[in-house]
Amino acid sequence: MLKDITLGQYFPGDSAIHRMDPRMKLILTIVYIVGVFMVSNLPGYLLALAFLYLVVRISGIKFSYLVKGVKPLRFIILFTFVLNLFFVQGETPIFSLGFFTLTKEALHNAIFFALHLVFLVMGTSVLTLTTSPVQLTDGLERLMHPLQRFHFPAHELAMMMTIALRFIPTLLEETDKIQKAQMARGADFESGNLLARAKAMIPLLVPLFVSAFRRANDLAMAMEARCYRGGDHRTRLRELRYTRLDVFGALATAAFIAVVMLEGRLLG
Protein backbone atom coordinates (compact mmCIF):
# COMPACT_ATOMS: atom_id res chain seq x y z
CA MET A 1 0.00 0.00 0.00
CA LEU A 2 2.80 2.42 0.93
CA LYS A 3 4.58 1.94 -2.37
CA ASP A 4 1.46 3.17 -4.20
CA ILE A 5 1.86 6.74 -2.95
CA THR A 6 2.78 8.94 -5.92
CA LEU A 7 3.20 12.28 -4.13
CA GLY A 8 6.87 13.26 -4.15
CA GLN A 9 7.93 10.83 -6.87
CA TYR A 10 9.33 11.84 -10.26
CA PHE A 11 8.44 10.15 -13.55
CA PRO A 12 11.10 11.01 -16.19
CA GLY A 13 9.76 11.92 -19.60
CA ASP A 14 9.87 14.35 -22.53
CA SER A 15 6.20 15.28 -22.80
CA ALA A 16 4.87 18.81 -23.19
CA ILE A 17 4.03 18.86 -19.48
CA HIS A 18 7.56 17.79 -18.55
CA ARG A 19 9.05 20.56 -20.73
CA MET A 20 6.97 23.34 -19.21
CA ASP A 21 8.66 25.88 -16.96
CA PRO A 22 8.48 24.69 -13.32
CA ARG A 23 7.35 28.15 -12.21
CA MET A 24 4.37 27.95 -14.52
CA LYS A 25 3.56 24.40 -13.40
CA LEU A 26 3.61 25.51 -9.76
CA ILE A 27 1.33 28.45 -10.48
CA LEU A 28 -1.08 26.43 -12.62
CA THR A 29 -1.24 23.65 -10.03
CA ILE A 30 -2.27 26.17 -7.38
CA VAL A 31 -4.81 27.73 -9.75
CA TYR A 32 -6.23 24.28 -10.59
CA ILE A 33 -6.61 23.39 -6.90
CA VAL A 34 -8.32 26.73 -6.23
CA GLY A 35 -10.62 26.01 -9.17
CA VAL A 36 -11.50 22.59 -7.74
CA PHE A 37 -12.36 24.18 -4.38
CA MET A 38 -14.69 26.54 -6.23
CA VAL A 39 -16.70 23.57 -7.52
CA SER A 40 -19.90 22.76 -5.65
CA ASN A 41 -21.78 20.32 -7.91
CA LEU A 42 -21.27 17.07 -9.78
CA PRO A 43 -20.88 18.56 -13.31
CA GLY A 44 -18.07 20.76 -11.98
CA TYR A 45 -16.21 17.77 -10.57
CA LEU A 46 -16.63 15.90 -13.83
CA LEU A 47 -15.14 18.91 -15.61
CA ALA A 48 -12.20 18.99 -13.16
CA LEU A 49 -11.68 15.25 -13.66
CA ALA A 50 -11.76 15.61 -17.46
CA PHE A 51 -9.20 18.44 -17.35
CA LEU A 52 -6.91 16.44 -15.06
CA TYR A 53 -7.28 13.35 -17.24
CA LEU A 54 -6.28 15.37 -20.31
CA VAL A 55 -3.16 16.71 -18.56
CA VAL A 56 -2.18 13.22 -17.39
CA ARG A 57 -2.63 11.80 -20.89
CA ILE A 58 -0.41 14.53 -22.35
CA SER A 59 2.25 13.85 -19.70
CA GLY A 60 2.48 10.18 -20.70
CA ILE A 61 1.63 8.95 -17.19
CA LYS A 62 -1.00 6.26 -16.79
CA PHE A 63 -4.09 7.65 -15.09
CA SER A 64 -4.48 4.39 -13.19
CA TYR A 65 -1.05 5.02 -11.65
CA LEU A 66 -2.30 8.37 -10.38
CA VAL A 67 -5.46 6.79 -8.96
CA LYS A 68 -3.34 4.20 -7.11
CA GLY A 69 -1.63 7.08 -5.33
CA VAL A 70 -4.92 8.00 -3.66
CA LYS A 71 -5.57 4.51 -2.26
CA PRO A 72 -3.08 4.74 0.65
CA LEU A 73 -4.94 7.86 1.82
CA ARG A 74 -8.36 6.25 1.83
CA PHE A 75 -8.51 6.13 5.64
CA ILE A 76 -7.90 9.88 5.88
CA ILE A 77 -10.51 10.51 3.19
CA LEU A 78 -12.97 8.18 4.95
CA PHE A 79 -12.29 9.90 8.28
CA THR A 80 -13.05 13.36 6.86
CA PHE A 81 -16.15 11.92 5.17
CA VAL A 82 -17.51 10.52 8.45
CA LEU A 83 -16.52 13.68 10.33
CA ASN A 84 -18.61 15.80 7.97
CA LEU A 85 -21.57 13.44 8.32
CA PHE A 86 -21.59 13.85 12.11
CA PHE A 87 -20.70 17.51 12.59
CA VAL A 88 -22.22 19.38 9.63
CA GLN A 89 -25.66 20.72 10.48
CA GLY A 90 -28.46 20.66 7.94
CA GLU A 91 -32.16 21.34 7.51
CA THR A 92 -33.17 18.44 5.24
CA PRO A 93 -33.10 15.14 7.21
CA ILE A 94 -32.72 11.89 5.27
CA PHE A 95 -33.03 9.47 8.19
CA SER A 96 -32.49 9.35 11.96
CA LEU A 97 -30.96 6.66 14.15
CA GLY A 98 -30.95 7.47 17.85
CA PHE A 99 -29.07 10.71 18.44
CA PHE A 100 -27.71 10.76 14.88
CA THR A 101 -29.60 12.48 12.08
CA LEU A 102 -28.22 12.34 8.56
CA THR A 103 -29.06 15.43 6.57
CA LYS A 104 -28.84 16.14 2.88
CA GLU A 105 -26.46 19.05 3.51
CA ALA A 106 -24.11 16.90 5.62
CA LEU A 107 -23.99 14.18 2.95
CA HIS A 108 -23.39 16.81 0.28
CA ASN A 109 -20.51 18.34 2.26
CA ALA A 110 -19.00 14.94 3.10
CA ILE A 111 -18.92 13.79 -0.52
CA PHE A 112 -17.57 17.04 -1.91
CA PHE A 113 -14.95 17.51 0.82
CA ALA A 114 -13.67 13.98 0.16
CA LEU A 115 -13.50 14.78 -3.55
CA HIS A 116 -11.56 17.96 -2.75
CA LEU A 117 -8.92 15.87 -0.98
CA VAL A 118 -8.74 13.41 -3.88
CA PHE A 119 -8.22 16.17 -6.45
CA LEU A 120 -5.73 17.92 -4.16
CA VAL A 121 -3.56 14.79 -3.95
CA MET A 122 -3.88 13.96 -7.65
CA GLY A 123 -3.17 17.52 -8.78
CA THR A 124 -0.02 17.89 -6.69
CA SER A 125 1.07 14.38 -7.72
CA VAL A 126 1.02 15.44 -11.38
CA LEU A 127 3.31 18.34 -10.46
CA THR A 128 5.91 16.17 -8.70
CA LEU A 129 5.68 13.36 -11.26
CA THR A 130 6.52 15.72 -14.13
CA THR A 131 9.05 18.01 -12.39
CA SER A 132 12.53 16.93 -11.33
CA PRO A 133 13.81 17.90 -7.86
CA VAL A 134 16.26 20.43 -9.32
CA GLN A 135 13.54 22.06 -11.44
CA LEU A 136 11.16 22.15 -8.49
CA THR A 137 13.76 23.84 -6.30
CA ASP A 138 14.62 26.38 -9.01
CA GLY A 139 10.95 27.10 -9.66
CA LEU A 140 10.14 27.66 -5.99
CA GLU A 141 13.22 29.82 -5.53
CA ARG A 142 12.50 32.01 -8.55
CA LEU A 143 8.88 32.50 -7.50
CA MET A 144 9.96 33.58 -4.01
CA HIS A 145 12.94 35.61 -5.27
CA PRO A 146 11.17 39.03 -4.93
CA LEU A 147 10.87 38.38 -1.18
CA GLN A 148 14.66 38.32 -0.81
CA ARG A 149 14.73 42.11 -0.70
CA PHE A 150 12.95 41.70 2.66
CA HIS A 151 15.72 39.27 3.77
CA PHE A 152 13.48 36.27 3.15
CA PRO A 153 15.55 33.04 2.72
CA ALA A 154 13.96 32.02 -0.58
CA HIS A 155 16.61 29.53 -1.67
CA GLU A 156 16.89 27.84 1.73
CA LEU A 157 13.12 27.50 2.05
CA ALA A 158 12.79 26.15 -1.49
CA MET A 159 15.54 23.63 -0.81
CA MET A 160 13.91 22.53 2.46
CA MET A 161 10.48 22.11 0.84
CA THR A 162 11.90 20.12 -2.07
CA ILE A 163 13.98 17.82 0.14
CA ALA A 164 11.00 17.23 2.44
CA LEU A 165 8.78 16.43 -0.53
CA ARG A 166 11.30 14.08 -2.11
CA PHE A 167 11.87 12.32 1.20
CA ILE A 168 8.25 11.12 1.24
CA PRO A 169 8.71 8.21 -1.23
CA THR A 170 12.14 7.44 0.27
CA LEU A 171 10.76 7.08 3.78
CA LEU A 172 7.75 5.11 2.53
CA GLU A 173 10.06 2.71 0.72
CA GLU A 174 12.15 2.37 3.89
CA THR A 175 8.99 1.71 5.92
CA ASP A 176 7.97 -1.01 3.49
CA LYS A 177 11.40 -2.68 3.78
CA ILE A 178 11.34 -2.58 7.60
CA GLN A 179 7.80 -3.92 7.65
CA LYS A 180 8.69 -6.84 5.38
CA ALA A 181 11.78 -7.61 7.48
CA GLN A 182 9.72 -7.70 10.67
CA MET A 183 7.02 -9.81 9.02
CA ALA A 184 9.73 -12.32 8.05
CA ARG A 185 10.56 -12.52 11.77
CA GLY A 186 6.95 -13.25 12.73
CA ALA A 187 5.44 -9.79 13.18
CA ASP A 188 1.75 -9.50 12.26
CA PHE A 189 0.50 -6.21 10.79
CA GLU A 190 -2.64 -7.43 9.03
CA SER A 191 -4.81 -9.20 11.63
CA GLY A 192 -7.07 -7.63 14.24
CA ASN A 193 -9.13 -4.45 14.22
CA LEU A 194 -7.94 -0.99 13.23
CA LEU A 195 -6.64 -0.20 16.74
CA ALA A 196 -4.68 -3.47 16.89
CA ARG A 197 -3.11 -2.76 13.50
CA ALA A 198 -2.15 0.73 14.64
CA LYS A 199 -0.44 -0.67 17.75
CA ALA A 200 1.39 -3.22 15.62
CA MET A 201 2.92 -0.37 13.61
CA ILE A 202 4.61 1.15 16.70
CA PRO A 203 7.73 -1.11 16.46
CA LEU A 204 8.31 0.35 13.00
CA LEU A 205 8.84 3.87 14.34
CA VAL A 206 12.24 3.45 16.04
CA PRO A 207 14.08 1.90 13.05
CA LEU A 208 12.28 4.33 10.73
CA PHE A 209 13.46 7.36 12.74
CA VAL A 210 17.00 5.95 12.87
CA SER A 211 16.96 5.46 9.10
CA ALA A 212 15.55 8.97 8.53
CA PHE A 213 18.26 10.60 10.65
CA ARG A 214 20.95 8.52 8.94
CA ARG A 215 19.74 9.56 5.49
CA ALA A 216 19.52 13.20 6.57
CA ASN A 217 23.08 13.04 7.91
CA ASP A 218 24.33 11.42 4.69
CA LEU A 219 22.65 14.15 2.65
CA ALA A 220 24.14 16.89 4.84
CA MET A 221 27.64 15.40 4.51
CA ALA A 222 27.25 15.07 0.73
CA MET A 223 26.16 18.71 0.42
CA GLU A 224 29.05 19.84 2.62
CA ALA A 225 31.54 17.76 0.61
CA ARG A 226 30.35 19.60 -2.51
CA CYS A 227 30.93 22.95 -0.79
CA TYR A 228 27.25 23.84 -0.75
CA ARG A 229 26.83 27.34 0.65
CA GLY A 230 23.27 28.29 -0.20
CA GLY A 231 21.92 30.16 -3.17
CA ASP A 232 24.29 33.14 -3.27
CA HIS A 233 25.92 33.47 -6.72
CA ARG A 234 24.63 30.02 -7.68
CA THR A 235 24.72 29.27 -11.40
CA ARG A 236 22.41 26.94 -13.33
CA LEU A 237 23.02 24.57 -16.20
CA ARG A 238 19.70 25.59 -17.78
CA GLU A 239 18.16 28.98 -17.15
CA LEU A 240 14.40 29.02 -16.71
CA ARG A 241 12.52 30.57 -19.61
CA TYR A 242 8.83 30.73 -20.44
CA THR A 243 7.92 29.19 -23.80
CA ARG A 244 4.82 28.71 -25.93
CA LEU A 245 4.03 25.58 -23.96
CA ASP A 246 3.66 27.72 -20.84
CA VAL A 247 1.37 30.13 -22.68
CA PHE A 248 -0.81 27.26 -23.92
CA GLY A 249 -0.91 25.78 -20.41
CA ALA A 250 -1.91 29.11 -18.89
CA LEU A 251 -4.64 29.63 -21.50
CA ALA A 252 -5.99 26.10 -20.98
CA THR A 253 -6.10 26.54 -17.21
CA ALA A 254 -7.71 29.97 -17.55
CA ALA A 255 -10.35 28.41 -19.81
CA PHE A 256 -10.95 25.70 -17.19
CA ILE A 257 -11.42 28.30 -14.44
CA ALA A 258 -13.75 30.36 -16.66
CA VAL A 259 -15.90 27.33 -17.46
CA VAL A 260 -16.03 26.34 -13.77
CA MET A 261 -17.17 29.84 -12.79
CA LEU A 262 -19.73 29.96 -15.61
CA GLU A 263 -21.04 26.50 -14.77
CA GLY A 264 -21.28 27.46 -11.09
CA ARG A 265 -23.39 30.50 -11.92
CA LEU A 266 -25.68 28.61 -14.28
CA LEU A 267 -26.25 25.60 -12.02
CA GLY A 268 -25.55 27.16 -8.65
Identify what each model region corresponds to:
Residues 51-61, 75-79:
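Alpha-helical transmembrane segments and their membrane-interface exit regions
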Residues 41, 45, 60-64, 88-96, ...:
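Transmembrane helix-loop junctions in multipass membrane proteins, especially transporters and channels
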Residues 25-26, 64-74, 246-249:
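Alpha-helical transmembrane segments and their helix-start/interface "positive-inside/aromatic belt" motifs
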Residues 1-42, 48-57, 142-145, 149-152, ...:
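Transmembrane alpha-helix interface motif
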Residues 73-187:
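Juxtamembrane/interface alpha-helical elements of multi-pass membrane proteins
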Residues 14, 37, 60-65, 97, ...:
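Membrane-helix interfacial "entry" motifs
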